[in-house]
């Protein structure tokens, strides 16, 4: 009857029958197919095809074919549609999944309204849930009353559970926290935690430095175990005894070997044809700048090994007595503790090498020995160090720059022929030269040559060795 045209359509009797039909069909409407179908269409252009009644012979004429989902359901806007949708929302509220109020609490946009989150468990309607543009989750808008209540309550419950948060070990003292919490919403035991931040260095979640949670001590055991967990200081660290003065354990043997290495180094430099064409002043500028680095390469090639011992600095009384002796012309006898080699300078004028400075020298030697550098490779590295166009006071910069570039090209071709594969060998050899930046020329002079040359300057030594035949 729903799809037929009657001659009584529009009459009073026809309207009464149709209104009674709608009243009886309304209670049976929930038995229609209401399982997650399309409830949002508003057209209802096509009437239901072949669906003229429900089970039991009850006629339903308000079912329409949806143009989107292709299913038969009541027309949007009708009384039956409103009753069914309101009943569906009320019935489905307790089954809605729990609102995830976890990771992202920091967004302030709330530009998109909450999608499909009409209430919290228990049927309590919540209209202040917004879709976050960062995390994609639905949570209250920042600045609303609900947001303030939830965040303040969350922080209040976090404080007692803070000692069990993962401290992150050695990265605990970092102050860079660029990322938000990384999915750690709870600690063991079900205690909520929202003040854990993802460290951009170690990737662990721990309290932000400077916060109240960060200042709370983790536990008594951790406070007692902190000195034991601290790693050893590296050689470049100036703390924990790295600046203690040291001296050679066998100075006579080591100083003689270092002097022989310096002679071989200057002999190698002087008889280079490309170095001999330079004026004497330009030769002196280059040698004074790089003699220490060239000597370190020579000592690594000779595989010089040495040991150091810790020495005590001269006391204030020794310094006063030594200064008085210099002022009086040496008439007063020196105390026994201040007796030194006749070529050595006064104690207060010397800068004794420290343990960290000596360790830098040993690290460079160990690096060279681990690479098994050949004689030709040592020669090319010395040429790279010698012809440095960035030396202050150099006049023939273009010429020196060309020599350094040519030396690097020869070294690259040599490593390509002797070591098959990519240029890893060439890169490793040049990386050893970077370690020379941590070695001070004055430390080498004090450690290896001061007991022999006394107060003579190393610059004067370079000039004398360049002008004489060696």
Swiss-Prot record:
It comes from the Eukaryota. A motif (LXXLL motif 3) lies at residues 146-150. A motif (AF-2 motif) lies at residues 461-466. Residues 1-253 are annotated as: 4 X 67 AA tandem repeats. A motif (LXXLL motif 2) lies at residues 80-84. Residues 205-469 form the NR LBD domain. Keywords: Cytoplasm, Disease variant, Nucleus, Receptor, Repeat, Repressor, Transcription, Transcription regulation. Pfam families: Hormone_recep, NR_Repeat. Gene3D superfamilies: Retinoid X Receptor. One of its GO terms (molecular function) is DNA hairpin binding. GO terms for biological process: adrenal gland development; endodermal cell differentiation; gonad development; hypothalamus development; Leydig cell differentiation; male gonad development; male sex determination; negative regulation of DNA-templated transcription. Changing residue 439 to S: In AHC; mild phenotype. GO terms for cellular component: centriolar satellite; chromatin; cytoplasm; intracellular membrane-bounded organelle; membrane; nuclear speck; nucleoplasm; nucleus. The keyword Nucleus applies. InterPro entries: NHR-like_dom_sf (IPR035500), NR0B1/2 (IPR033544), Nucl_hrmn_rcpt_lig-bd (IPR000536), Nuclear_hrmn_rcpt (IPR001723), Nuclear_receptor_repeat (IPR025900). Changing residue 287 to G: In AHC; the patient presents an inappropriate tall stature and renal ectopy. SMART domains: HOLI (SM00430). Homodimerization involved an interaction between amino and carboxy termini involving LXXLL motifs and steroid binding domain (AF-2 motif). Heterodimerizes with NR5A1 and NROB2 through its N-terminal LXXLL motifs. It is linked to Adrenal hypoplasia, congenital: A disorder of adrenal gland development characterized by absence of the permanent zone of the adrenal cortex, structural disorganization of the adrenal glands, adrenal insufficiency and profound hormonal deficiencies. AHC patients manifest primary adrenal failure usually in early infancy, and hypogonadotropic hypogonadism leading to absent or incomplete sexual maturation. AHC can be inherited in an X-linked or autosomal recessive pattern. 46,XY sex reversal 2: A condition characterized by male-to-female sex reversal in the presence of a normal 46,XY karyotype. Nuclear receptor that lacks a DNA-binding domain and acts as a corepressor that inhibits the transcriptional activity of other nuclear receptors through heterodimeric interactions. Component of a cascade required for the development of the hypothalamic-pituitary-adrenal-gonadal axis. May also have a role in the development of the embryo and in the maintenance of embryonic stem cell pluripotency. Homodimer. Interacts with NR5A1, NR5A2, NR0B2 and with COPS2. Interacts with ESRRB; represses ESRRB activity at the GATA6 promoter. Belongs to the nuclear hormone receptor family. NR0 subfamily. This is Nuclear receptor subfamily 0 group B member 1. The lineage of its organism: Eukaryota, Metazoa, Chordata, Craniata, Vertebrata.
